[in-house]
Amino acid sequence: DKRQPGKLSELKFGLECGGSDGLSGITANPMLGRFSDYVIANGGTTVLTEVPEMFGAEQLLMSHCRDEATFDKLVTMFNDFKQYFIAHDQPIYENPSPGNKAGGITTLEDKSLG
């Protein structure tokens, strides 16, 4: 295999969450947001994974939708995941782990954004 030039518009990047702490909201996450904005502005694609990790950051993510159809799809996805959690008696807004809390995360919003 040899490296070859390509277009950013031909690439798709999957973004996976790592361990959240009190600094990730001012370091890694903003950098990945700017990276995503750059990739998308140049015709590429970024994909966030782990929808439950987005609970608490819905409004911020929805504000980045390119059009109303995308916004509606995102709202539906969030609502469907929340209904799944409710149907299986799983807590939605109690996600921070002991490790997150030790790192300075106190709420789901802190974890989702940081």
List each model region and its residues.
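Anaerobic metallocofactor- and corrinoid-dependent redox/one-carbon enzyme cores
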Residues: 10, 15, 21-114
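Active-site cavity-forming subdomains of large catalytic enzyme subunits
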Residues: 1-3
